[in-house]
Design a protein with these regions (language model features):
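Short beta-strand elements that form the blades of beta-propeller/WD-repeat-like
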Residues: 17-35, 71-81, 116-122, 127
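Extended low-polarity, hydrophobic cluster-rich segments
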Residues: 22-28, 43-45, 54-60, 67-80, ...
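Surface-exposed loop/turn elements that mediate protein-protein interactions on large endomembrane-trafficking
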Residues: 1-9, 35-58, 83-105, 125-141
Length: 141
């Protein structure tokens, strides 16, 4: 039912990256780098001319599809509010409809298990089970 893959991140210019996926692409513009490394980028969707109100860590960018369909397609990122690098949360983005939902915590590990997606943080031992995208608290961007 669910399929998860790492997104391909392509370096475009000195401060811009592109993430391509079946339903389009998103551009990541370098904004800052926290003391521990890992670049943090603003997120722009050129097809819809929308910018995400969060910045994205340049790591663990995943594409999630349901039954390998481009009609039911999502992206998972580790994100922070702009101009910050703490308070990391996972966001699920539905690019086709310009909306996102926060999982309200940080889960660096993501995997599929028996028709559900398991987000897990081995540091805090917290887990988030996602089996229905309609149950998320969606916000437009």
């Amino acid at each position: 039912m669910f399929d998860i893959e790492d997104c391909k991140v392509t370096f475009l210019t000195e401060d811009t990256y592109e993430v391509s996926f079946p339903a389009g692409r998103m551009l990541l513009k370098y904004e800052t780098e926290p003391p521990h490394g890992d670049e943090v980028c603003s997120v722009y969707f050129p097809e819809s001319n929308n910018e995400l109100p969060y910045w994205c860590y340049l790591r663990n960018i995943k594409q999630i599809s349901i039954d390998k369909s481009t009609e039911s397609f999502f992206i998972s990122i580790e994100a922070v509010k702009p101009h910050q690098w703490s308070g990391v949360v996972n966001l699920i983005i539905e690019p086709k409809h310009s909306k996102y939902a926060s999982l309200d915590d940080w889960y660096p590990s993501v995997k599929v298990e028996e028709n559900k997606i398991c987000f897990y943080n081995s540091y805090t031992k917290k887990e988030y089970i996602l089996d229905d995208f309609q149950q998320l608290n969606w916000q437009s961007f």
